[in-house]
Amino acid sequence: MAKREKKSYVIQSVGNALNLLEEFKGDRDELGVTELSKRLDLHKNNVFRLLATLEAKGYIEQNKATENYRLGVKSLELGQTFIKQLGLGRQAKPFLREIVEKCNEMAYVGIIRQNSVIYLDVEEANQMVKVDNRVGWRIPIHCTAIGKVQVAYSSEEELEKLGILDDMERCTPNTIVDRGEFLKHLKEVAKQGYALDNEEYNLGVRCVGVPLRDYTGRVVAGISVAGPSFRMTDEVLKKEIIPAAKAAGEKASKRLGFGA
């Protein structure tokens, strides 16, 4: 009786909408109406209505170029809340503190979503002159250490899907905006295991970024250390910042199951 009563509360249309959202969990970033119809075993008209409703609420968005659909900002916001409560931000927190204790520079963790990096957590340093970064802020991928280090292990095709190769805004005179030069730079980042932002996003600010990997070896986030250029000299980067960042990234990745 109890099971029958519980089942009676299930709303089929809501269930269909949630099933549709779950189809975007795999490797495919975008899906079309026909494929969703087959996967969900629903008529195309029903899929259209579900997509229209979810799009109106911001949980799904349409790529106008391909006419396929992908997750929208609202889905991202729900994911951010979950991560903040249970995931990466909390997992990385002690390692951010470790960096700050060693280097006395700001450290933060971020993930790539919707063609930008989103900060999940920030650990401040006790400095009079500091970089202004806050949880929830979005920054570009192509001109930041935390962005570049997360895409450095991606194929050119994957980078195309992210949409950053054709939209590399020049934020400072140091920003790399040439496609070929950027791809060459990413290969070097992947080889050395860390990325540098040499005043590419903000003049007067330098950053180091290292990857965070999960139990599959996939890069799921990045840790970065940022500070004013007059403190983040080449010597300081080499002797203090880069070793501390790499050590923290390795420990955080191990906590996420990498190498287990």
Language-model segment annotations:
Residues 80-128, 153-156:
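All-alpha effector-binding/dimerization core of bacterial HTH-type transcriptional repressors
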Residues 129-201:
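Short, solvent-exposed recognition segments
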Residues 179, 221-260:
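Juxtadomain coupling helices with adjacent low-complexity linkers
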Residues 206-210:
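Short hydrophobic beta-strand micro-motif common in sensory/regulatory domains
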